[in-house]
């Protein structure tokens, strides 16, 4: 295969990954805009990640379509592509790290007001990438490197210092935070007396699967760069590195939609509306439309509400994100009629009051998962 064929193959992979990421991130942002029940501290971080990824992928796609693969001179499109890759990728990684930290903060450290860190997140997630980008531009090290433009092949020190060094740190720190969070939640679930342990494990998985997607999508980059450092340049790791690193936004978006029934009910109702005009899937469309705002609660007690209502802070539990902040992280997503939903809301309010009294009277750690914690 010639060098030009390699470049064309790289560009094709880039376009496929960029287009899929654009579609996925757009769906998440539309859902965040249209569905107010989705808006909380965690989903805000995810939406900012998606907005950053969308910005990066749109510009990258336009440049890839317009940029000639045989161009050898560094012009404005070349510099813009390098800026988008460096700034956009670093910002997306940092938003993922902030998501890892926020989940750890909520679950393990039991932070009652995670929103107070958001202003620092903004400064960090956009400030550090800006510094790396400015240094890259000021040192005149941008060159065409195959299917895109970036730091030239002869500047390994800059590549590591401005890009891969921060990446390895972010990847490793995210993995550690996921491990600590998983260890904590697993130990609490295992020591509980709940009849819903399977649902609690599903809840735990849905808390951390965003981070797992990040770790998996970028592990190929780590393997490929290690091989490159050993002066090995195999095709398969390079292709996997290119595809999964660029399509990270797509897989993160799919994970978000999977975690939130609001999303697939909302888009499902909109999609089936087309067929219902022709008398097809009418009942299914109506049921989704009626229940599109029914984001089922998690199987775990909402710790923030419990603490706000005076529950003993020494009780060990797996916190959700408060009533206003609850994500749909349940194992079963039952669709109900409006009447059934109203009855269940009244029933849930009664049980929430019962749990509050139960927590005040009993400080046993196993109370977090008693069998009244229903979905």
Swiss-Prot record:
Its main location: membrane. It is a multi-pass membrane protein. Residues 359-375 have a biased composition (Low complexity). Residues 1-10, 66-82, 139-161, 224-234 are extracellular. PROSITE patterns: G_PROTEIN_RECEP_F2_4 (PS50261). The chain crosses the membrane at residues 11-30, 45-65, 83-108, 120-138, 162-180, 205-223, 235-259. GO terms for molecular function: adenylate cyclase regulator activity; cAMP binding; cAMP receptor activity; G protein-coupled receptor activity. Gene3D superfamilies: Rhodopsin 7-helix transmembrane proteins (1.20.1070.10). GO terms for cellular component: plasma membrane. It comes from the Eukaryota. Residues 338-375 are annotated as: Disordered. C-terminal Ser or Thr residues may be phosphorylated. Keywords: G-protein coupled receptor, Membrane, Phosphoprotein, Receptor, Transducer, Transmembrane, Transmembrane helix. InterPro entries: GCR1-cAMP_receptor (IPR022343), GPCR_2-like_7TM (IPR017981), GPCR_cAMP (IPR000848). CDD domains: 7tmE_cAMP_R_Slime_mold. It holds the Pfam family Dicty_CAR. Residues 31-44, 109-119, 181-204, 260-375 are cytoplasmic. Residues 346-358 have a biased composition (Basic residues). The modification Phosphoserine is found at residues 192, 298, 303. Receptor for cAMP. Coordinates the aggregation of individual cells into a multicellular organism and regulates the expression of a large number of developmentally regulated genes. The activity of this receptor is mediated by G proteins. Plays a key role during tip formation and late development; involved in cAMP-directed patterning of pre stalk cells as they sort before and during tip formation. Belongs to the G-protein coupled receptor 5 family. This is Cyclic AMP receptor 2. It comes from Dictyostelium discoideum.
